[in-house]
Amino acid sequence: MSSRTLYDKVWNFHQVKELPGGSTQLFIGLHLIHEVTSPQAFSALNEKKLGVKFPNLTVATVDHIVPTSNQQRPFSDPLAEEMLATLEKNCKTHGIKFHGIGSNSQGVVHVMAPELGLTQPGMTVACGDSHTSTHGAFGAIAFGIGTSQVRDVLASQSLAMNKLKVRRIWVEGELQKGVYAKDLILHIIRHLGVKGGVGFAYEFAGPAIEKLSMEGRMTICNMAIEGGARCGYINPDETTFKYIKGKEHAPKGQEWDKAISWWKSLASDSKATFDDEIQLDGSSIEPTVTWGITPGQGISIKETIPNPEFLPKNEQQIAKDACKYMNLKPDEPIEGQSIDVCFIGSCTNGRLSDLEEASKIVKGNTVADGIRAFVVPGSQKVAKEAKEKGLDKIFLKAGFEWREPGCSMCLAMNPDKLEGRQISASSSNRNFKGRQGSANGRTLLMSPAMVAAAAINGKVTDVRKFLKE
């Protein structure tokens, strides 16, 4: 009987050859590119007079630098306009499909690719973006890569990689009402640490994982990188197949039946051996909020800010630095902390179900005085479907701004930024110093529904209070 993990199976299937020094040449089945990490890669190809090996296996979109308030061309930021124009030119030159401004399929790369059915079980996926691990939700092995590796994939459709160890994170039970995939992954990162996954691929499994929707699974895998893992994945199942079926790039007819048969064979075998295994109880997890400057510095809504003096010695200094930077006092509750800005969006939580859950909290309420709150759909498709459901009107009526798709305030590469010492309640994935555009800006990570609750009350709030009403 086979005793292999999904990671083993996908790795072996895409292995081209062993390289001197012990690494492996790995074929990449899907290469996603955007405007930020691709220009230098294309320049390197041009210098060496190389073409793109398999243009049909590369797909491009624009997301990081696009303004979300006005996407009329040319952009008011000349650098952003230049980056977009460069990507357009490179895609045209090399015959790469580009989902650009004005396209009904444009969006944040890790949102739009799954929507189109581009991401499928058993694939290897690469993109010049840290959160490429998102695609592991489909039973793919997905890596974020640097610019030089983007060049290598364009030129050869392969990468030199070292095989990872595999840690299975088994989550028992079922998430409570008001607890979401974002809370679960923040809890996992808190438990294992931001460096706990170094050298590992994370396999997320167990009843609590299996009960998640595909969009929830994408949230989980999206943030595997924040726990130090090189990638994260979930075994494909009927939930996966139902999501993919009928999408533009999904197999059709007899090819669909063949694909299903193969996809089912990919799941880790019952006798598979893992390098490490962790078991958690999903039913005990509460709404979770970060208080510090790493995604691992998270606590449940009912806890207080940790006192650095009572933490392990290797965590004390960073906790002290975090408290000072965030202007939060040890032993004070996180619930009730005031906020200035609320952001719902990003490749972590900018999908339709995220907006739906947040809208349930917002409906019939009003954004608190002095709070700036905005919603940024993850793609044109998300925006269209949200409008069809009337979600935009719910948010607008409550006092939120409704924006065009893009990465927005997840990172400081477009006009959506914090100012000065503002503190945000954000559904994004990173709370590093300066991450949201101001060198002194502060970020509290939480689920979209928790962000919505914070916007209504003007402070960190247990979303479950709204769900009881």
From Swiss-Prot:
Gene3D superfamilies for the chain: Aconitase, domain 3
EC annotation from Swiss-Prot or TrEMBL: 4.2.1.33
Matches recorded under Pfam families: Aconitase
Reactions catalysed: (2R,3S)-3-isopropylmalate = (2S)-2-isopropylmalate
Cofactor notes: Binds 1 [4Fe-4S] cluster per subunit.
BP term (GO), one: L-leucine biosynthetic process
Domain of life: Bacteria
Enzyme class: lyase
HAMAP family assigned to the protein according to its UniProt record, in alphabetical order: LeuC_type1
Function: Catalyzes the isomerization between 2-isopropylmalate and 3-isopropylmalate, via the formation of 2-isopropylmaleate.
Similarity comment: family membership: Belongs to the aconitase/IPM isomerase family. LeuC type 1 subfamily.
NCBIfam families assigned: leuC, PRK05478.1, PRK12466.1
Protein name per Swiss-Prot or TrEMBL: 3-isopropylmalate dehydratase large subunit
